[in-house]
Each structure stands twice: as C-alpha cells, then as structure tokens.
C-alpha cells in the first residue's frame, strides 16, 4: 500500500476547547498535515457536507452535540470520511460505541504525540 501525500489528504478537526484545538493543529502541522479546525459541531458538519474530508478528528465531550452524534451525522453527509476520536474521557463503553459506529481510531487526550500521529497516518493510509 502506498501512503498518501499529507498535502493531498483533507483533515478536519473538531474540539470545543480552543487550546486543545490549537495544540492539535500545531502538532499535525509540524509534520506537514494541513487541517481545517472547528469548535462548533454544526459548522464542522456543514463544512464536511460540502468538502467531504478524508479524515475527521472528533472530540467526544462537547456541550452542544457530543462526538458520537457528530460521528453519526458525519456518516450521513460524508460517508467516506474516516473518523479518529480524541477525548478526555477514557470510557470503554464510549470507545466501543465509537468503534462500532466506524471510527478508525480512538485516543485519550494526553496520548503520546508519536502514537497519535501514527494513528492519523494509518487512518489516512487506509483510504488507499
């Protein structure tokens, strides 16, 4: 399998915490990923419906719409988008629900940068 060029893979990030959003964007940018970042689930879904990102990195605990609901709605508007969940809550039942609903990876915030980046890369590579 040939890895996709980071420049050609569309990545979207959704997290309601602006500081986490900035830090995650910086991390992805540091290795060449270009990211569209959102704090609002509705705006994220509107963007996904028109741009169909290759990979979506989604927080689970958000006030207006939780990440599992975003994941379900994303499947309807952009079914080919691969999902990576990134959350502060390590809950096995939530992990199971996300993975059963089609998430490619599930990470707890604070994960080692190299592990997270490897997971995003593996998710992008699965597009081939």
Model-derived features: positions:
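Acidic, metal-coordinating helix/loop segments flanking the phosphotransfer/catalytic sites
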Residues: 37-55
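Two-component/phosphorelay signaling modules centered on CheY-like receiver
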Residues: 18-36
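Short amphipathic alpha-helix used as the core "switch/output" element in two-component signaling
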Residues: 46, 68-79
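Alpha4 helix (beta4-alpha4-beta5 surface) of REC/receiver domains from two-component response regulators
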Residues: 69, 90-105, 111-114
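Acidic catalytic/metal-coordinating carboxylates
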Residues: 39-40, 66-69
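Non-catalytic signal-transmission and effector/linker regions of two-component phosphorelay proteins
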Residues: 1-12, 18-19, 25, 114-128
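The feature encodes the CheY-like receiver
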Residues: 21, 63, 91
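Active-site residues of response regulator receiver
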Residues: 59, 87
